[in-house]
UniProtKB/Swiss-Prot annotation:
Compartments, record wording: Secreted
InterPro entries per UniProt: Long_scorpion_toxin_alpha/beta, Scorpion_toxin-like_sf
Keyword Glycoprotein recorded: no
Protein name in UniProt: Opiscorpine-2
Domain BetaSPN-type CS-alpha/beta: 55-95
Native species: Opistophthalmus carinatus
Length: 95
């Protein structure tokens, strides 16, 4: 039960962070308070950092919101491809 509650709180903080209501530093401080400065806390902070710098919402080579494609069409007229969590215009995945 406690693990599920922790996961729920963590996902809630990620959702709030993606809406720009809170910044990355405040979420990482909350992780330090709730989880602590241990291995699990470090992993959680790394995930928050990776998602916070994700500008076009690319996740695992997928563009669920279409933000990458829209950005590339406006910027260069090329097709947008997600490479992990990064958006690249006109550069398809090679694997």
């Amino acid at each position: 039960m406690n693990n599920k509650l922790t996961a729920l709180i963590f996902h809630g903080l990620l959702a709030i962070a993606s809406c720009k209501w809170l910044n990355e530093k405040s979420i990482q401080n909350k992780i330090d308070e709730k989880i602590g400065k241990n291995f699990l806390g470090g992993m959680a902070k790394a995930v928050v950092h990776k998602l916070a710098k994700n500008e076009f919402m690319c996740m695992a080579n997928m563009d669920p919101t279409g933000s990458c494609e829209t950005h590339c069409q406006k910027a260069s007229g090329e097709k947008g491809y997600c490479h992990g969590t990064k958006c690249k215009c006109g550069v398809p995945l090679s694997y």
